[in-house]
């Protein structure tokens, strides 16, 4: 049982109890998972800000459990904060902006491919602020939040099925616009990105960008995956939940925070590596979801015998 930092080491094999941490590095990290049971967690990155950390939209959080009998290659994308990405926006989908810092990137884990259509779990990034007091929207969660302050257009929230008004797309936040001495924030990345903001043209009016949405691939959410999905029912996550960036969550370091601040983060906890020779644990598929059996029996000579 060991704890690894995937931004510093390459893990060649895993064991039950291992923790695979993936802080932001500006690039994805790959790890090969043998057949087993795994807990996936992702924290979205915070949107950029100019004068106060409180104005950058906070990132969301998502968690789910995967049971795989064939093993899988996992690609971990920890989003970059808007302040890390500067005007280009945070790594992994943060929306750019013409001046100041862009939107925060979403954080996600992809299975067997680096395609956006292989994302199995996503936490939305927050939108960047428009000006010194014009806040960006928080990331999702099932939905992000719109940029709430200032005057102008765009800055819509990413949702479960669409990008936010202002150029949010599948995986990326929209760009913030500067005009007439006003500044619009960039949208946060995520399942669907938040919209970038365009301030009105009446003067020095600023507006924050929208937050991106989150997603977990489950038996109930799979139907909302857009055309081109590279996942299948054997990869449904269970025990899944999401929290938006305005909710109380546990940070990667174990402290309590309201939404995630700073750069994004991914974590895989190895709950169990399956041993084909052990017999138990056994899993049964019910309504498309793999569940662990608490006991099992085999019929021999017309008699049922409990497996030990």
Per-range role (PLM):
Residues 87-95, 148-165, 169-171, 222-255:
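Surface-exposed intrinsically disordered loops and tails
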Residues 32-39, 69-73:
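Extended extracellular/luminal ectodomain segments enriched in beta-structured repeat modules
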Residues 136-183, 276-280, 287-308:
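Intrinsically disordered, low-complexity terminal/linker regions enriched in Pro/Ser/Gly
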Residues 1-32, 226-308:
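Enriched but not universal
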């Amino acid at each position: 049982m060991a704890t690894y930092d995937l931004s510093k080491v390459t893990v060649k094999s895993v064991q039950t109890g291992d923790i695979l941490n993936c802080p932001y590095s500006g690039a994805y990290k790959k790890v090969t998972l043998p057949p087993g049971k795994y807990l996936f967690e992702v924290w979205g990155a915070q949107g950029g800000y100019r004068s106060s950390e409180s104005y950058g939209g906070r990132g969301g959080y998502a968690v789910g459990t995967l049971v795989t009998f064939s093993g899988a290659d996992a690609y971990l994308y920890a989003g970059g904060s808007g302040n890390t990405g500067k005007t280009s926006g945070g790594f992994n989908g943060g929306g750019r902006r013409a001046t100041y810092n862009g939107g925060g990137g979403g954080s996600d884990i992809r299975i067997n491919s680096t395609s956006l259509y292989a994302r199995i779990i996503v936490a939305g990034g927050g939108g960047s602020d428009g000006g010194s007091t014009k806040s960006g929207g928080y990331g999702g969660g099932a939905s992000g939040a719109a940029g709430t302050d200032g005057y102008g257009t765009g800055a819509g929230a990413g949702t479960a099925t669409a990008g936010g008004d202002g150029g949010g797309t599948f995986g990326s936040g929209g760009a913030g616009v500067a005009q007439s001495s006003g500044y619009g924030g960039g949208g946060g990345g995520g399942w669907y990105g938040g919209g970038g903001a365009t301030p009105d043209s009446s003067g020095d009016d600023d507006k924050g960008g929208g937050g991106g949405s989150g997603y977990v691939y489950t038996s109930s959410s799979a139907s909302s995956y857009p055309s081109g999905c590279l996942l299948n029912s054997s990869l449904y996550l269970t025990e899944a939940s999401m929290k938006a960036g305005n909710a109380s969550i546990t940070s990667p370091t174990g402290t309590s925070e309201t939404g995630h601040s700073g750069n994004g983060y991914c974590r895989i906890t190895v709950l169990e590596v399956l041993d084909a020779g052990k017999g138990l644990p056994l899993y049964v598929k019910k309504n498309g979801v793999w569940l662990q059996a608490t006991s099992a029996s085999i019929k021999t000579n017309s008699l049922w015998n409990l497996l030990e």
